[in-house]
Swiss-Prot record:
Family label: Belongs to the PsbX family. Type 2 subfamily.
Coiled-coil annotated spans: none
Keyword set, alphabetical order: Membrane, Photosynthesis, Photosystem II, Thylakoid, Transmembrane, Transmembrane helix
Protein origin, superkingdom: Bacteria
Keyword match Transcription: no
Name this protein carries in UniProt: Photosystem II reaction center X protein
BP GO annotations: photosynthesis
GO cellular component: photosystem II; plasma membrane-derived thylakoid membrane
Role summary: Involved in the binding and/or turnover of quinones at the Q(B) site of Photosystem II.
Subunit and partners: PSII consists of a core antenna complex that captures photons, and an electron transfer chain that converts photonic excitation into a charge separation. PSII forms dimeric complexes.
InterPro entries: PSII_PsbX, PSII_PsbX_type_2_subfam
Taxonomy of the source species: Bacteria, Bacillati, Cyanobacteriota, Cyanophyceae, Synechococcales
Length: 61
């Protein structure tokens, strides 16, 4: 582990590069949530509610 940290320090990464990378990663997570997770969740909730209504209405007949 010590050798890896020395290698990273010797590579002369700046904190600005690391900060920009972290901001980009967080932005990617937020974009993925907005584009994939939230619409998929909304769709699944809609379908499950619709199915629940269909099952309760057919059960009363």
């Amino acid at each position: 582990m010590f050798q890896i940290s020395n290698l990273l320090l010797a590579a002369d990464f700046s904190s600005e590069v690391a900060n920009n990378s972290a901001v980009g990663m967080i932005g990617s997570f937020i974009a993925a949530a907005l584009l994939i997770v939230i619409p998929a969740t909304a769709f699944l909730i809609f379908v499950s509610q619709k199915d629940s209504l269909n099952r309760t209405s057919t059960g009363r007949r």
